[in-house]
Amino acid sequence: METVLEIKGLCKSYGDFELRNLNLSLEKGTLTGFIGPNGAGKTTTIKSILNMIALDAGTIRILGMDSVSGDLEIKSKLGIVLDDGHFYEDLTLKKMKNLIAPMYPVWNEGAYQSYMEKFSLPEEKKIKDLSRGMRMKYALVLALSHEAELFILDEPTSGLDPL
């Protein structure tokens, strides 16, 4: 099997919090979730994987590349949904998509339009006018529209209505 994510000896500390010597290996085709109480290190681990915070120690390899030296190439192959969004509030959904889509080597406009319709997301609405659930749906639409090789989702159902 092909390893898509490998973490060795990850250490990160903030004040009273310490993530110590985390080791993890994920094979292609597996579905894995982090479950634990608030403050257990789930989001810290995800932010470490995404090279959003500096590690105190350890290494992370994603899709065979070092997470630091291969950062841009790796991110072009990831479908990412973060709990805190990271969108430009004053842009419409369409303008945000037009800003994001060119960053990916592959963008599937048909998939994007299909997901926008399925999730009832109006392209002309500004991001600041979306509910938390609608923002999550939009983040999922973007993550699913560029044929990602690996998905990293931080609380992707937060704010979503139950089915």
Residue spans for each PLM region:
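ABC transporter nucleotide-binding domains
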Residues: 2-7, 12-163
